[in-house]
Amino acid sequence: MRTLKIVAPLLIAFSILLYIYVESTSPTASLPDVDLPHSEQSTEAAEMPLVSPLATIAETLTVNSPLASPPPPTVTHTITYDSAAVAADSTLTETAASRQTPIWRYEIIRTYPHDPTAFTQGLIWLDNIFYEGTGLRGRSSLRQVDRDTGDVLKQIDLPAQYFGEGITILGDKLYQLTWQSHTGFIYNKDTFTKLADFPYPTEGWGITHNGQQLIMSDGSSTLYIWDPDTLEELGQIQVTDQGQPVMRLNELEYIHGQIYANVWQTDHIAVIDPESGNVTAWLDLTGILAPADRTGQEDVLNGIAYNAENDTLYITGKLWPKLFEIRTVVPQ
């Protein structure tokens, strides 16, 4: 019994010492809970991005934000009027601005009555009266019209098979085109006595002159130069805007060395350099015929005449109830 009392404490002490020894030499010894240096982190942990998912999303949103992105490249649009579609008015404004083709506005000086049954195809201001050529088969005519009242002073009707088109006066002769009949007429400008017929191979749309030659359109981007006596073709003008063809050239007027051309189915007039064929400006007549003046019977803008005394233009359209005297407003 005495021996047991002595050995038992020794065994307990030995056990404690053995436990301490084992714990102090064990490879799995417990260490304080501290972070390891970055150089000792696992390879997998070192390769993982040290960015939280939310931070990644935030970065992505920032990169894709329009405010953080560089400005988009400038896109240049070009107006091309072709047989399939015609650019809208707003498109003209946007694209002409991007191409640096000047856009002219207008100021209405006076408003005059216009025969709403006149399908205007050509318009001339001479000796204080209008000469007007009208279209539609069975309704085509050549007229003298009083500006202030809109009354018809003189009129001859074309044979029913002809669809009348543009007119011009050079000297004492008045020239009138027809649309698809490949036939034009020459009249005495005062009496409307027909002097001759003449053929041409294309459609007839608009006609004007530069004082020496006739200039004619056929609805394409080409203008034709004719000898006024023989009606032979002397040359062509290819009309382009920033290198692109301008189609549907219609009624023409020659003003200050430039050709003004209605572009069919638009409210715009192309101002054309006859030497190069380049469009030097666009006259935007959007809204010139107010909604209150529209009855639903009106057709497109067509008809340009020049008043040299006032340096103003007369503008109307097919079946329009009004005719406008305007002054162009060129942006500074």
Q: Could you say what each language-model-derived stretch is?
A:
Residues 130-137, 174-181, 216-220, 261-265, ...:
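Conserved beta-strand positions in repeat-built beta-propeller and related beta-rich domains
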Residues 1-6, 13-106, 332:
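Intrinsically disordered, low-complexity Ser/Thr/Pro-rich tracts
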Residues 127-128, 171-172, 211-212, 256-257, ...:
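Short coil/turn segments that connect the beta-strands within blades of beta-propeller domains
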Residues 96-116, 147-151:
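A short helix->beta-strand "capping" segment at the edge of beta-propeller domains
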Residues 146-150, 188-192, 228-231, 273-277, ...:
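Short loop/turn segments that connect beta-strands within beta-propeller blades
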Residues 111-116, 156-160, 196-202, 238-244, ...:
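Surface loop/turn motifs at the tips and blade-to-blade linkers of beta-strand repeat domains
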Residues 109-141, 156-168, 319:
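Beta-strand-rich domains and repeat architectures in extracellular enzymes and scaffolds
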Residues 120, 249, 296-305:
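Signature of short aromatic-glycine-proline-rich micro-motifs recurring in repeat-based ectodomains
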